[in-house]
């Protein structure tokens, strides 16, 4: 909503989730107020450049037009993006919509929300299968030593000897801590150019610094590990 990782990694643990399907309950709710009630589902003519996929509509919730969303992160992390954003961007096949969110809250392992213009259960059921996107600028602010996974993708990874280990191609949550997926160029058995991947735990014993401005992560990791 992804989710985010923290500078706590530098202290030996990662306290953030990521855009993976591991939601947990969080009881906060949000509302845009009466003015938002004038909104409705709209065709998305201009898709935001910073749109990040944070979930998917999986079902209706109740009888009054609420929808149920499986967040691609725990509800206290990437789910925060769903709860904080007052406008969601929806995509299903070639169909793209923009919707104002009147209310949202966690419900068990999901986030439930009331979109403007969706007034009954049938209309909510018709929204199943939409992927949900939120603008990156609408994500909740993090502490200085915390990072959203989406912001780590593409950063160069180097070790303390300044040897390049590749670039972050993705993240994994193994249930205990986060793991960097680092892709690097290599040569295949046939001599043709290829790519390979190394997995580096995002914990303090290995991750020394994360410099988003320089787009670089420094790790205690050898190239031949």
UniProtKB/Swiss-Prot annotation:
Subcellular location: Cytoplasm
UniProt source species: Burkholderia vietnamiensis (strain G4 / LMG 22486) (Burkholderia cepacia (strain R1808))
Protein name: Ribosome maturation factor RimM
Known function: An accessory protein needed during the final step in the assembly of 30S ribosomal subunit, possibly for assembly of the head region. Essential for efficient processing of 16S rRNA. May be needed both before and after RbfA during the maturation of 16S rRNA. It has affinity for free ribosomal 30S subunits but not for 70S ribosomes.
Record-annotated membrane-spanning stretches: none
UniProt entry keywords in alphabetical sequence: Chaperone, Cytoplasm, Ribosome biogenesis, rRNA processing
Similarity field: Belongs to the RimM family.
NCBIfam families per record: 16S_RimM (TIGR02273)
Description of its domains: The PRC barrel domain binds ribosomal protein uS19.
A Gene Ontology cellular-component term: ribosome
Subunit structure, as described in the record: Binds ribosomal protein uS19.
Molecular function via GO: ribosome binding
Ranges of residues in domain PRC barrel: 144-225
Gene: rimM
Highest taxon in the source lineage: Bacteria
InterPro entries: PRC_barrel-like_sf, PRC_RimM, RimM, RimM_N, RimM_N_sf, Transl_B-barrel_sf
GO biological process terms on file: ribosomal small subunit biogenesis; rRNA processing
Residues forming coiled coils: none
């Amino acid at each position: 909503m992804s989710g985010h990782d923290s500078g706590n990694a530098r202290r030996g643990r990662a306290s953030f989730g990521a855009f993976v399907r591991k939601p947990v309950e969080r009881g906060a709710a949000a509302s845009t107020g009466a003015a938002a009630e004038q909104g409705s589902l709209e065709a998305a003519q201009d898709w935001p450049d910073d749109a990040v996929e944070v979930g998917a509509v999986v079902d209706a919730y109740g009888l009054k037009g609420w929808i149920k969303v499986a967040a691609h992160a725990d509800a206290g992390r990437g789910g925060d993006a769903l709860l904080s954003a007052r406008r969601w961007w929806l995509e299903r096949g070639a169909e793209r919509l923009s919707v104002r969110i009147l209310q949202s809250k966690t419900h068990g392992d999901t986030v439930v929300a009331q979109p403007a213009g969706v007034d009954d259960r049938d209309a909510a059921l018709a929204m199943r299968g939409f992927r949900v996107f939120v603008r990156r600028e609408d994500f909740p602010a993090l502490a200085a030593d915390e990072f959203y996974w989406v912001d780590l993708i593409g950063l160069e990874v180097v070790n303390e000897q300044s040897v390049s280990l590749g670039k972050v191609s993705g993240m994994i949550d193994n249930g205990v801590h986060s793991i960097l997926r680092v892709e690097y160029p290599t040569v295949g058995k046939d001599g043709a150019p290829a790519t390979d991947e190394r997995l580096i735990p995002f914990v303090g014993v290995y991750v020394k610094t994360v410099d988003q401005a320089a787009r670089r992560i420094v790790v205690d990791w050898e190239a031949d590990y």
